């Protein structure tokens, strides 16, 4: 029987609560993020896990962390999440190219890695509501840099007892990402563009979450907020699964021997995906280095190099927009863990970040980051990587994966480390068609993104994913754009408050 795991806020104002309560709440009342009181070790060996499919692996990982869900509840959630919505039975296949293993996390309904967690979150959430006798309708409030929004909308559309509101930076997502969101069906969905960047959207959402007056108004009308962003532990736990799965799969295929270390490279924005790899390592997966790959918004690269987190810098719009982030929310969980689970210290750092835009960690905390390596890739390096690997191997990747691939090349040059390496491939190249075509030297500004998708399909011999072809002529249903100061009004209008 797995030992119970309870969750508390990184900022410490809240006592321990069960997993289902943490998932329901999303963000702690003090603005902190929920973290487990201990990280359990895998109970089955990796050899045993290697005999399981993706769904079986998911159960083995999730039952250890979501301990108040019954076996029946978890298996129900897992079987409904990882089904024919994915275009491959493997759910997360691995491709080898140019000496690295690409863990493809984009085979779900919206062709981005967010599907891996957001296809199960609605089931975890509605199960949690039943378990906790929640009387209110759950309002999912989400900020997106492009991918989370669509994946959350697809997951929650027409789910009884829920509504979903997504804010995105009007001028900070790719045309295909925007088209995916604004054509979303479902009577319970609301998509709003904001005049501002992703950090503005995320800060606005966090503010709404912690607004006590608004919470009271909502409660009176039978609503309560929760989150589909990676601040929700229900997003993070399912992401641990694919790191366990990838190791077990490489083991099963004889590409590594039992116990061999692997390195993991993750293109990083909000720090959730790489934090899941850190948790997988702490659960017993032999991961050596956790290589954190940034684009030109290299606040995390600087943090790993100097120990200072400083968001006081220019926000750069890049060809990897899901990583255009200067306030990396999930880093707070890592700060909490490396401070020795010290909530007071974490709250102090986050206070400094809010007030001064920066903080510096202690030498002792820095010594606990030895397993992390921070790297970054410029736009040119990103584009060169897409082209070089495609011309050399025929393997096509999107801009975010290319950032990771470029950083991996730099890492091996710098260190000579030959450890087998898994690179998280986080989106289909068809989500960022224009940038990928530009990288291949076949860009054409006179053509639309869908026309370029046809050409990319021809060049790469890869079929256009259903997620792109189905939105070509879809009706635009969401046209609202507001200033970043008007987010509360927009929420109230949608909920009829």
At which residue positions do the language-model features occur?
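PLP-dependent amino-acid enzyme catalytic core
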Residues: 1-497
